[in-house]
């Protein structure tokens, strides 16, 4: 999770 917490 690089920042897109909703994605992964």
Swiss-Prot record:
**Example of a GO biological process term:** neuropeptide signaling pathway
Keyword Secreted among record annotations: yes
Listed A to Z, the keywords are: Amidation, Neuropeptide, Secreted
Tell me which domain of life the UniProt entry assigns to the organism this sequence originates from: Eukaryota
Subcellular locations according to the entry? Secreted
Q: Which residues carry this modification: Glycine amide?
A: 8
Please state the protein's primary subcellular location.
Answer: secreted
Q: Name one GO cellular component term.
A: extracellular region
| Purpose | This cephalomyotropic peptide stimulates contractile activity of cockroach protodeum (hindgut).
Q: What is this protein called?
A: Leucokinin-2
Species of provenance: Rhyparobia maderae
